[in-house]
């Protein structure tokens, strides 16, 4: 069927749109809003469910959003089976009767001055695929993939007609969700259209499956291009109809997502006005809330970015409400990193709202408005964590966690040690980007191209400091092992081989130069006192993860890398690989320090990053990473001492010569044994505000120090600030 894409244009001409003023776009002036949609039919709706969405009322939701001090409303207009407005393409749920939820919301939003954004689900269009089975994605065996649509099919024209319908209401913009290609096998798409277009582009047939060779490299590019073309095509169509209508796509280019979703970190983040991503302890961990925000920022530098968080205790699709302090912790973590935040409310099955939830939203949003002058300032970074999409795809392959663990472990170490950090992405990296960070860390970046090596060389020559861990640079462009590391010259060492173990050990003996003592700080194993012998000894400690044997050329070696013992059980493959064995013999140096130009490269032969995110996380492994940063960058602008349960974000406002230190106290109570998958548990939601001490030492002389909370106790002595904080979120303002 050919869709008439201009069917609704005449209707649009007479519509007064919400976003027609010359004022700043809604997303540039907003910090908090709500997304509201019904829940209960995610896996298939039925006309027998006449109660579903019966009370889902756009007018009531707009009023509730405005009363809770939300600055915009994202209202559900389309899910897999239903439309919640009068659509010619999809039926409405029977419970709505003659009501039009989108019309209700837009009319009320216009009265309230509340921008209304249409939430429109893209992937998993169940009803549409029942009507158009020819649009289904197909697996390598020619079988349709249940629920999935092919983005190269006629579905794009269908979606263009759908957005025309919704634009006619006068909405401020679209949030287009689920623009993925699936979150696991079976993979697509091998439909006739895809096969034809692939052959036209590459003059050869598609690979028969996931082959991890040259053909699969082309297939990955083809998949990425298909998603990009779909998004750009839809955005262009929307802007042609109404240039003021905003467009954002829900994004899955960040960990734990990989190639299977059809998105790269940068390629698929910038196809709208801003990127939207998600957080949530249930799906991403507490620690990754801030990481996701920085990832979205790095993917779209200079643009606003939106993060969605959920109301529910467990996940999106429950109707529970988290304690206020739990909501506050996630909300202010995201705002501190510079994003704007959409809180997702999934209504009751009948579409009704929970007044207790909106009372909590109102309390949290009121606090945001009180503090809004303290968000979205220039970040202060010390370390850039380098993320390689090529390593994700071709080293991680079907187990991307093998790569993610190092990246996330490096992040964990920086957070726990209160070292300001940001994210650097391989797709948009430049010398200017690198030079925003005094130190750049390559956490097991297995695949490093010649172009990247040249860029790192420029960065180091000019005074940059590079930290390299584990197997960085030891793989070819398709993940194949190399006989040498691409980083040999930078590291000042020759790659001799990779250990076939992950239970590797490090011993830190007396450093060859006194200035290297920094590497040993707060690592008791490096300075164990043997009372009976009357001497200080260095004791090996486990550094779980990949390890490489190096032979120094121009680098100074520090410490020892030790391989683990192996027994007969190992040779017979009867030993549990998750259980580490003790240290055996030394096989090479643990650390290499090489000076190039005005800068330096510090290499860990082992993987303290991987270890920090592992089940065998020792304090020593993260201290190694932190000490490396402090050795390479001894004159940090701020040194922050705080409990590991406190996250810190530092920003700068040059016009007022003010540094802001956001303090975020995570205070989840202990959890009990789970009913399944012991010992892996979700943390308990935060109920109580924590109390903790913080000490900050600044490089610049301070003129004044102020805390936002009256309860915070402050004491300043020159450039040293001590604070006692008793809240989830605090901001210390340091004027210099």
Task: Spell out what each predicted region is.
Residues 24, 28-30, 105, 116, ...:
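Carbohydrate-binding surfaces of carbohydrate-active enzymes
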Residues 53, 118-169, 178, 194, ...:
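Active-site-adjacent "subsite" loops/lids of carbohydrate-active enzymes
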């Amino acid at each position: 069927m050919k869709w008439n894409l201009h069917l609704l244009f005449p209707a649009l001409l007479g519509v007064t749109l919400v976003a027609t003023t010359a004022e700043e776009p809604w997303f540039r002036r907003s910090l908090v809003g709500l997304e509201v949609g019904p829940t209960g039919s995610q896996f298939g709706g039925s006309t027998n469910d006449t109660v579903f969405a019966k009370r889902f009322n756009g007018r009531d939701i707009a009023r509730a959003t405005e009363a809770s001090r939300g600055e915009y409303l994202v209202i559900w207009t389309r899910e897999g089976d239903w439309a919640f407005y009068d659509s010619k393409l999809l039926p409405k749920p029977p419970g709505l009767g003659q009501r039009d939820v989108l019309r209700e919301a837009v009319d009320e939003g216009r009265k309230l001055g509340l921008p209304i954004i249409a939430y429109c689900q893209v992937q998993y269009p169940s009803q549409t695929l029942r009507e158009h089975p020819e649009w289904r994605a197909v697996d390598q065996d020619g079988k349709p993939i249940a629920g999935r649509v092919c983005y190269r099919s006629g579905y794009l024209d269908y979606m263009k007609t759908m957005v025309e319908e919704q634009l006619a209401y006068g909405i401020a913009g679209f949030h287009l969700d689920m623009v993925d290609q699936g979150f696991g096998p079976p993979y697509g798409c091998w439909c006739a259209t895809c096969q034809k277009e692939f052959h036209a582009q590459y003059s050869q047939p598609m690979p028969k499956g996931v082959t991890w060779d040259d053909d699969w490299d082309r297939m990955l590019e083809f998949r990425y291009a298909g998603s990009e073309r779909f998004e750009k095509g839809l955005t262009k169509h929307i802007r042609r109809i109404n240039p003021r209508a905003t467009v954002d796509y829900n994004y899955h280019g960040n960990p734990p997502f990989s190639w299977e979703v059809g998105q790269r970190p940068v390629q698929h983040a910038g196809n709208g006005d801003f990127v939207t991503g998600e957080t949530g302890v249930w799906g991403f961990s507490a620690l990754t809330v801030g990481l996701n925000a920085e990832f979205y920022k790095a993917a779209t530098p200079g643009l606003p970015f939106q993060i969605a968080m959920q109301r529910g205790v467990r996940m999106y699709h429950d109707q529970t409400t988290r304690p206020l302090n739990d909501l506050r912790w996630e909300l202010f973590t995201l705002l501190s990193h510079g994003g704007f935040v959409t809180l997702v409310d999934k209504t009751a099955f009948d579409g009704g709202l929970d007044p207790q939830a909106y009372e909590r939203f109102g309390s949290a949003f009121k606090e945001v408005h009180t503090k809004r002058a303290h968000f979205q300032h220039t970040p202060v970074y010390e370390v850039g964590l380098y993320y390689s999409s090529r390593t994700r795809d071709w080293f991680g392959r079907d187990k991307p966690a093998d790569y993610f663990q190092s990246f996330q472990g490096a992040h964990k170490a920086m957070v726990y040690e209160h070292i300001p950090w940001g994210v650097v992405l391989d797709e948009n990296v430049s010398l200017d980007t690198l030079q925003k960070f005094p130190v750049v860390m390559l956490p097991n970046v297995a695949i490093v191209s010649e172009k990247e090596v040249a860029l790192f060389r420029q960065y180091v020559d000019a005074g940059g400091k590079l930290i390299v861990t584990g197997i960085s640079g030891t793989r070819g462009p398709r993940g194949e092992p190399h006989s040498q590391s691409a980083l040999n010259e930078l590291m000042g060492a020759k790659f001799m081989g990779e250990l076939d173990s992950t239970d590797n050990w490090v011993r830190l003996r007396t450093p060859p130069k006194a200035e290297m003592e920094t590497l040993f700080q707060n690592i008791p194993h490096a300075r164990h006192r043997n009372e009976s012998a009357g001497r200080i000894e260095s004791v090996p400690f486990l550094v779980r993860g990949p390890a490489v044997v190096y032979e120094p050329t121009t680098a100074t070696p520090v410490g020892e890398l030790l391989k683990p013992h192996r027994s007969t059980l190992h040779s017979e493959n009867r030993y549990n690989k998750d259980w580490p064995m003790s240290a055996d013999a030394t096989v090479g140096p643990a650390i290499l320090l090489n000076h190039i130009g005005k800068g330096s490269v510090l290499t860990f032969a082992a993987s303290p990053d991987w270890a920090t995110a592992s089940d065998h996380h020792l304090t020593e492994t993260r201290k190694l990473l932190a000490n490396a940063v402090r050795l390479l960058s001894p004159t940090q602008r701020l040194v922050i001492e705080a409990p590991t349960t406190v996250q810190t974000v530092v920003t700068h406002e040059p016009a007022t010569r003010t540094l802001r230190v956001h303090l975020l106290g995570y205070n989840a109570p202990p959890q009990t044994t789970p009913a399944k998958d012991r010992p892996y548990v979700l943390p308990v939601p935060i109920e109580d505000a924590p109390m903790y001490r913080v000490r900050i030492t600044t490089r610049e002389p301070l003129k004044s120090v102020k805390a936002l909370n009256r309860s915070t106790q402050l004491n300043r002595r020159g450039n040293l600030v001590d604070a006692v904080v008793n809240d989830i979120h605090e901001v210390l303002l340091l004027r210099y």
